[in-house]
């Protein structure tokens, strides 16, 4: 799906990411990254399970962060999706400066695609030779599917990964 036969699972994700970072537009953090503590704070989520995948080593051409976040009810998950959509739309067309772990990056957001139960947005890193990410978020029952698919030729990979996870959640009913 990502165009790489050598991607392997890496770090399992079991909690929200509380990495200290600064964004020039703080409300774009959820449109930029998956499973962020600042984004999920106060949402009522009850659990998180995720995984990071890439080629081996630190010099990879493909990177995916995928997470499922559970809520006590479908209504709470849907409310989180609606809030996320509103924030993501406010990031569209804007460039955000991110300072993370002592490094500064600039990302430009494209327009948000889709509407609940699934949304996505493409963001492109400036000065990174075409490195871009598709953020995708979907809701299925009481679960938020939170995806970030990055590489040099990203089209709809985040969306397709989200669809596969939604199908699994829907089959568990």
Residue spans of the language-model regions?
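N-terminal "mature-domain start" segment
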Residues: 1-50
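Short Gly/Thr-rich strand-loop-strand
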Residues: 12-23, 86-132, 172
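Short, surface-exposed beta-strand/loop micro-motifs that present aromatic residues
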Residues: 48-56, 132-140
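A short acidic-to-branched-hydrophobic micro-motif
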Residues: 49-82
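Short, surface-exposed coil-to-beta transition loops
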Residues: 62-65, 129-135
């Amino acid at each position: 799906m990502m165009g790489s036969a050598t991607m392997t699972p890496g770090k399992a994700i079991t909690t929200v990411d509380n990495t200290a970072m600064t964004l020039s537009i703080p409300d774009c953090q959820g449109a930029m990254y998956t499973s962020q503590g600042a984004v999920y704070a106060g949402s009522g989520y009850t659990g998180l399970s995720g995984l990071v995948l890439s080629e081996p080593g630190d010099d990879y051409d493909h990177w995916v962060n995928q997470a499922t976040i559970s809520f006590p009810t479908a209504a709470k998950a849907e409310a989180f999706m609606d809030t996320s959509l509103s924030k993501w739309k406010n990031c569209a067309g804007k460039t955000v400066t991110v300072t993370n772990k002592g490094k500064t990056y600039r990302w430009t957001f494209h327009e948000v695609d889709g509407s609940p139960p699934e949304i996505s947005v493409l963001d492109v890193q400036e000065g990174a030779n075409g490195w871009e990410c598709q953020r995708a978020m979907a809701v299925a029952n009481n679960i938020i599917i939170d995806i970030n698919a990055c590489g040099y030729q990203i089209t709809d990979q985040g969306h397709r990964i989200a669809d596969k996870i939604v199908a699994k959640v829907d089959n568990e009913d």
